[in-house]
Amino acid sequence: MNTQARLTSTQWKARFKGYVQVTKPGIIFGNLISVAGGFLLAAKGDVDLVLMLASLVGLSLVVASGCAINNCIDRDIDAKMQRTCKRVTVTGEIPLSHVLLFGIALGVLGFGILALFTNTLALLFAAIGYVVYVGIYSLYMKRNSVYGTLVGSFSGAVPPVVGYCSVTGQMDMGAVILLLMFSLWQMPHSYAIAIFRFNDYAAAKIPVLPVAEGMAKAKHHIVLYIAVFALVSTMLPLAGYTGTAFMAVTCATSLWWLTMALKGYRQDVDMPRWARQVFGFSIITITALSVTMALDFQAVSQTPLFTLVR
């Protein structure tokens, strides 16, 4: 009996771990930082803790839902990739229908929290980001188009905008800059992953840029997107949304990231190692900017492009 009980306990622990893994906790944590950054930038020191908690929890559940359903959709290509071949949706450790229902339940709960505590615009952005990620990117673009990364970058840029709009209830220039900034950041971040995971993507026949059009073109795009990202990031302080501290941090991190990317043109470059460095510093860059904009906000007058309040 004791042995059987221990075995059952072990199985339940493994099952729980599997459910956690399908939500991709690393992605959730990264999005939490960007949501908090957008929220605190908009709040400008006048923080509604209940609203902030609801925005963080609601959006995290929505992201977790999208990731779980993405695991269901990608199970066939995940089986061909070394990095993902042991996911529970591939091994059958958890039935596919259970993961799908789990994802739906997370989505209902997440959208419910956003609907109850935030406003129409924040909810709308969360819904659009979800549809783009699950319905357009995961179901079609990722498998069939080199532009899948570009489409997916929009959904990846939604979380800070949801945080921002939860406070303002309006789409102003600050929200537009955040959307552009985080969309641009996604591109070199994702291309770097595609380079050091090249063999996996090639095996699964996923037409990411390095696989579909070559490493050289991917390097050009990485440098170009980092350069444009650096310029767009300066718009927050130039438009008065943040101060000199943010300007200093964005210039320092972006220029260092760009310098790192340019090293990819060396003749003797170790491409996988270089790509991992570009990827790693992309996380440092966006984390630093999210934290700095949360602290270095300015009381700029917000002129809405349009307003949707609850």
Swiss-Prot record:
Q: Where are the transmembrane segments?
A: 25-45, 49-69, 98-118, 121-141, 145-165, 176-196, 222-242, 245-265, 277-297
**A biological process term (GO) from this entry:** heme O biosynthetic process
Cross-referenced InterPro entries, in alphabetical order? Protohaem_IX_farnesylTrfase (IPR006369), UbiA_prenyltransferase (IPR000537), UbiA_prenylTrfase_CS (IPR030470), UbiA_sf (IPR044878)
Record GO terms (molecular function): protoheme IX farnesyltransferase activity
UniProt pathway: Porphyrin-containing compound metabolism; heme O biosynthesis; heme O from protoheme: step 1/1
User: Gene Ontology cellular component?
Assistant: plasma membrane
Major place of residence: membrane
* Membrane topology, record value: Multi-pass membrane protein
Catalyses which reaction(s): heme b + (2E,6E)-farnesyl diphosphate + H2O = Fe(II)-heme o + diphosphate
- Keywords, alphabetical: Cell inner membrane, Cell membrane, Heme biosynthesis, Membrane, Transferase, Transmembrane, Transmembrane helix
EC number in record: 2.5.1.141
Which cysteine pairs are joined by S-S bonds?
A: none
State its location(s).
Cell inner membrane
Q: Domain of life of the organism in this record?
A: Bacteria
Q: Which CDD domains match?
A: PT_UbiA_Cox10
Gene3D superfamilies assigned to the protein according to its UniProt record, in alphabetical order:
UbiA prenyltransferase (1.10.357.140)
Miscellaneous comment in the UniProt entry for this protein: Carbon 2 of the heme B porphyrin ring is defined according to the Fischer nomenclature.
PANTHER family, per database record: PROTOHEME IX FARNESYLTRANSFERASE, MITOCHONDRIAL (PTHR43448:SF2)
Role = Converts heme B (protoheme IX) to heme O by substitution of the vinyl group on carbon 2 of heme B porphyrin ring with a hydroxyethyl farnesyl side group.
Give the UniProt family note.
Belongs to the UbiA prenyltransferase family. Protoheme IX farnesyltransferase subfamily.
Protein name per Swiss-Prot or TrEMBL: Protoheme IX farnesyltransferase 2
What species is given as this protein's source? Shewanella sp. (strain MR-4)
List the gene name.
cyoE2
